């Protein structure tokens, strides 16, 4: 049996965020009433995949039991991966991470490769903080690829991968089932889960936030109430699907920012059944229930929070994943675009589609920007002038857009690649230089 990644999946999904799921590709493959029977059905092996400590509080504990044809331990020893090593996982000062400038930074899109390049080969680290070895912080990668992975499988031991496609669909076959993901959707692949990526549209480009720390979860809603923002039912987890395929395959592992490879004589996507709450999932950003002001002022961007990774300090997150989707603006006598801002947190932004309402030009789909701790940022001169003169007695719909932000509590440090690449816009600062002085002490 082989998983067919040449066409869209036909199986449905399991609905809900971090639910206790149970799914089997063969009837009766899940053991009844126990996790590790003396003999599992169909001659399968029982294997637990733990995403948190055994003793983590029940509400935060993540693990799944897999029933597979061969255990994950069956492969040859790892050796260094011979391909390009453009990944960084430790963001202390080094040759890969030079001193971080306080400048506002912006990049054009990562160009499509000129040679055949798959998802793994197309990864490059732009920025990050903390350390994968310390299981703290994150790495922000871009990917640009034009070839499906061929008999190659990948996993990251460093963190969970929040994937934001910008161009091209991704058919992602994982150990626990298949996710078909398109632009305007996101996928999250847990730490350690093995997968392969097919590119049905040829070229593919996007963003990844690799979370080294506490697992992503839905935010509390506070006074919003019991509904709103990203609703749990809209998160989709794959049903069990497996392949029983033998041959010469390659398993690529990411550990402490380095890529390693091992020969493996079978497809590792051989999980026939599984149950638990540690599994990949996807979410359609177009289903986000946007909250906003219906009186005056522009609320803080925390109202656009989709997922976050928490810290031990209440209200202070290690990572916030925020989106700026289509929405109505109705606030009267209010400057409606995002305001001028300096932030104790650091903000890495990307654009999936359209235009961002705080930047008239220069910030394009596939591009990125970085505004670090206390770096002044906000609307450009043209946006400010137009918004200051607009008629706010009438609602206005911000349409044809999907921007997002990875916001972190600690400094986001750009890599040497990010600071030296030709995609860096050296003239980004000029978008604010045309802002005129309006101050007149004689006229209020």
From Swiss-Prot:
Q: Which protein family is named in the record?
A: Belongs to the homogentisate dioxygenase family.
- UniProt keyword annotations, A-Z: Dioxygenase, Iron, Metal-binding, Oxidoreductase, Phenylalanine catabolism, Tyrosine catabolism
**One Pfam family cited in the UniProt record for this chain:** HgmA_C
Q: Relate the protein's function as given in its record.
A: Involved in the catabolism of homogentisate (2,5-dihydroxyphenylacetate or 2,5-OH-PhAc), a central intermediate in the degradation of phenylalanine and tyrosine. Catalyzes the oxidative ring cleavage of the aromatic ring of homogentisate to yield maleylacetoacetate.
Q: Which InterPro entries match?
A: HgmA_C, HgmA_N, Homogentis_dOase, Homogentis_dOase_bac, RmlC-like_jellyroll, RmlC_Cupin_sf
| Gene Ontology CC entries for this record | cytoplasm
Q: What is its EC number?
A: 1.13.11.5
Gene Ontology biological process: L-phenylalanine catabolic process; tyrosine catabolic process
Q: What is this protein called?
A: Homogentisate 1,2-dioxygenase
What reaction(s) does this enzyme catalyze? Answer: homogentisate + O2 = 4-maleylacetoacetate + H(+)
Q: Name one GO molecular function term.
A: homogentisate 1,2-dioxygenase activity
Q: What class of enzyme is it?
A: oxidoreductase
Instruction: State the organism of origin.
Output: Burkholderia multivorans (strain ATCC 17616 / 249)
Q: Which co-factor is required? A: Fe cation
Highest taxon in the source lineage: Bacteria
Q: Where is the active site?
A: 298 (proton acceptor)
User: Which positions bind homogentisate?
Assistant: 356, 377
Q: In which pathway does it act?
A: Amino-acid degradation; L-phenylalanine degradation; acetoacetate and fumarate from L-phenylalanine: step 4/6
The entry's Fe cation-binding residues are 341, 347, 377
Quaternary structure, from the entry: Hexamer; dimer of trimers.
Q: Signal peptide position in this chain?
A: none
